[in-house]
Amino acid sequence: MLAISGLVKRYGARTVLDGLALRVEPGEVVAIVGESGTGKSTLLNLIGGLEQADAGSIRIAGTDLATLDDDARTRLRCRAIGFVFQAFHIVPHLTALENTVLPLVLQGVAAGERDARATAMLAAVGLGSRTAALPRELSGGELQRVAIARALVHGPALVLADEPTGNLDPDTAQTVLALLNNRARAGNAATVLVTHSEAAAATADRVLRLARGRLAASGATAEHGTDGR
């Protein structure tokens, strides 16, 4: 579960996030939309522990990021968070299986167990026959499936997806989004999806718009209130 309150982030004199609040329950998918430059990616970086907030709290599975030193924050990130990015971030000289297994390697999972878990996750995303394929042998949709498998293989409490379908054609994008959301829900992960795509946002349980440093309900989800919960 993700719980954020009073989050503030400044870059010099510019306040990007101003008292932002957000709560995402296990198994829930929340889409964040907004204009370019409103701080959507900054928000994900703060949640993922890649940047430090100026004020406020971020709790992931009950742990307040502000109470952790750099090493502990890295351990939490490896254990509890799965990342899916627009640019895939697939290691080019590793096979689909070797890419997928990386979070389990970082956690020190035994080789036999981690290979079995990665193989099962690749099968779950429709790549059971492509485990030995190198990235250059995979399509854009297949590469994003590898990225999803890698993000979910270690059973994270939280999945952060930053424009995960930005490089995909519309049909492939819909397939990949359905896969990401369904697998995250199956693993009971809280999911935050940042997107410019209305079609992508429509797959979420809630849609929140980031503007003037805060989140408000957007479109058909307005009945959920305006405080990000």
Whereabouts are the PLM-identified features?
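ABC family nucleotide-binding domain
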Residues: 1-211
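Conserved switch/coupling elements of ABC/ABC-like ATPase nucleotide-binding domains
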Residues: 212-223
